[in-house]
Every structure is written in C-alpha cells, then in structure tokens.
Amino acid sequence: MARFTIVLAVLFAAALVSASAHKTVVTTSVAEEGEEENQRGCEWESRQCQMRHCMQWMRSMRGQYEESFLRSAEANQGQFEHFRECCNELRDVKSHCRCEALRCMMRQMQQEYGMEQEMQQMQQMMQYLPRMCGMSYPTECRMRPIFA
C-alpha cells in the first residue's frame, strides 16, 4: 500500500510538471502614439514616407473593397510581391520608428483617397502590419482615428 501511494504521488507530480511545462505565453508589444521616447529621432525618417511597396500593397488591397474578390492569379501574385517588399521596407525602418512611418503612410493614403469607411479598413490592416510581417517589435501600432 505504501508503494502504491508513492507511485501515485510520483505520477501526480509528473503530471503536474508536464502540465506546467506546456504553458504558452503570448506577448504582444504595442507601440502607442507618443509612447516611445525615441520617436523624436523618427521625424526625418517618417517625413520621407518612402515606403513605395507598402503604398502599392495598400492600393491593391483597396481594390478589393471596390471590385469582386475574384481577381486574376497575376493580380494576386503582384499583391503578394508588394506585401513581401512592404515587409522588407518596414524592416529597414528603425523598430522604434515603424509605427510613425505607418501613420505617415496612412496620412498620405487619406489625402489620396479620403473615403471614411475604406480608410478605416486600411487603418486596421496597417495597425497589424508589423505582426503580419513577422516582426517582434512592435507587433501592432495604435492608430488615431482618421475621421472623428
């Protein structure tokens, strides 16, 4: 009976250790507007707003709100290529400047298109673009409402 109790205690302890070893911790880093102390150094970089592929990708995504989702394979291939290059452009921006660069791009898109509903949809995509590109910091950028 004592051996049975010991074996049962060992099995219980092993199950407890196994269960705690399989915990998953998900960390999300969000950069808020004005939160980064180093954003002052981003002014030059964000004023440039030279993220040509990101702009092209956003324009191609904009087309999905206007057209049917049934687009040609060639158009989808071009869209993917712009997305991939957009991620590369975003990686080239200093990590603490990425959100400001995305906000700058959103301001340009707003001047170009200005449609409230469409811009809100684009803004949601831009908020999560760092995560979509597989970046560890920031994983998302808070965007101020474009239309209030």
Curated annotation (Swiss-Prot):
Keyword terms of this UniProt record: Allergen, Disulfide bond, IgE-binding protein, Seed storage protein, Signal, Storage protein
Stretch list, region Immunodominant epitope: 46-55, 48-57, 76-86
SMART domains: AAI
Tissue and organ distribution: Expressed in seeds (at protein level).
Positions of the pro-segment in this chain: 20-38, 69-76, 147-148
One annotated GO molecular function: IgE binding
InterPro entries: Bifun_inhib/LTP/seed_sf, Bifunc_inhib/LTP/seed_store, Napin/2SS/CON
Record region (Involved in IgE-binding): 24-94
Residues annotated as signal peptide: 1-19
GO CC annotation, single: endosperm protein body
Disulfide cross-links: C42-C97, C54-C86, C87-C133, C99-C141
Pfam families: Tryp_alpha_amyl
Gene Ontology BP annotations: seed maturation
Entry-linked SUPFAM superfamilies: Bifunctional inhibitor/lipid-transfer protein/seed storage 2S albumin (SSF47699)
Subunit composition and interactions: The mature protein consists of a small and a large chain linked by disulfide bonds.
Family of this protein: Belongs to the 2S seed storage albumins family.
Function in brief: Seed storage protein.
Descriptive protein name: 2S seed storage protein 1
Organism: Sesamum indicum
